[in-house]
Amino acid sequence: MMESIKKLRELTGAGMMDVKKALADAGNDEEKAIALLRERGIVKAAKKADREAKEGLVRFVVDGNRAAMVEVNSETDFVARNSDFQALVEQVAQAALRAGTNNVEELRNFTLDNGETVGNAVAAAAGKIGENLVLNRVAYIDAGEGEHVAGYVHSNGKIGVLVDLLGGTEAQAKDVALHVAAERPQYLNRDEVNAADLEKEREILTNKALNEGKPQQIVDKIVQGQIGKFYEERVLPEQKFVKDNSVTVGQYLGNAQVKRFVRFEVGAQ
C-alpha cells in the first residue's frame, strides 16, 4: 500500500491523503486511482474557471513543411515559469501538430498517446498546479511545395509567430518571423485592409487637415500621403524591415511572398 502511495504521489503530484483516498475508492487499482485523481483534478480546476488567466506561454513546433503553435494561459507569471506548466505547453504544441488543426475545440478533444484528451490533460494540470489554465489559441500550417515554414518565440515565451513563405529561403522565413514578432503587422497585403477601417481613417485625416486650416485643394494630397503611411505601419510587405530599415520587408524578400503569418501574444487577441 505504501509503495503504491509513493508511486502515485510521484506520478500525479497529489497529496498523500488524496492518493490514499483514491486508492481506497479504486480498490487499490493504481490505474483507476490515477484516473480518479485526474477526475478530481478536473473538478478543482472547474472551481477555478472563474478566475482570469492572462499570463502563460506560447510554443511552436516545426516538422518539415508543417508547423503548429499554441497559447496556453495561466493566472500568474510564476506558474508560467513553472517547469510542469512549460512541459504541458510543449505537450499541447506537439499534439497540435499531430492533430493538424486551427480549431481550439478540435485540439481540446484530440486524444494523446496516453488515452486522455488534450482538454483533460490541461484540466488535470490545473488541478495539480492550483491555477486556472486555459488553452486559448492554436494555429497550424501545412505548407506546399516550394514553401518554407518558420517559427519564432520571444525569449520570455510571451510572443510567438509562424510564417509560411513561398519562394526565398528558410533564413528569410525566419527573419520575417522575427520581424512580425517585433513590428506587429496587421495585414498580409493591402487587399486585406478592411474598407470601412480605411474609409474611417481617411475621414479622420481629412477632418484633421481641415481643422488645421489646410486649404481644401491640397487636403486630398495630404491625406493620400498619410494613407500611404497608414499602409507602411500596418501592411507586412510595406513595413520597414526590422533588421535593415533602409528596405521594406517586400524589398528584402524580392520575388518571395509571405502566404500567411500568425502572431500570438499572451493576453492579447
Swiss-Prot record:
Q: Where is this region: Involved in Mg(2+) ion dislocation from EF-Tu?
A: 76-79
Q: Which GO terms describe its cellular component?
A: cytoplasm
The reply to whether Transmembrane figures as a keyword in the UniProt entry is no
Q: Which InterPro entries match?
A: EF-Ts_dimer_sf, Transl_elong_EFTs/EF1B, Transl_elong_EFTs/EF1B_dimer, Transl_elong_Ts_CS, UBA-like_sf
* Protein name (record): Elongation factor Ts
One matching Pfam family: EF_TS
List where in the cell it is found: Cytoplasm
PROSITE patterns listed in its UniProt record: EF_TS_1, EF_TS_2
UniProt KW Cytoplasm keyword:
yes
* Single GO MF descriptor: translation elongation factor activity
- Give the record's family classification: Belongs to the EF-Ts family.
Q: What does this protein do?
A: Associates with the EF-Tu.GDP complex and induces the exchange of GDP to GTP. It remains bound to the aminoacyl-tRNA.EF-Tu.GTP complex up to the GTP hydrolysis stage on the ribosome.
Primary localisation category: cytoplasm
Query: Keyword set for this entry?
Result: Cytoplasm, Elongation factor, Protein biosynthesis
Q: What Gene3D superfamilies does this protein map onto?
A: 1.10.286.20, DNA helicase RuvA subunit, C-terminal domain, Elongation factor Ts, dimerisation domain
The UniProt entry, under HAMAP family, shows: EF_Ts
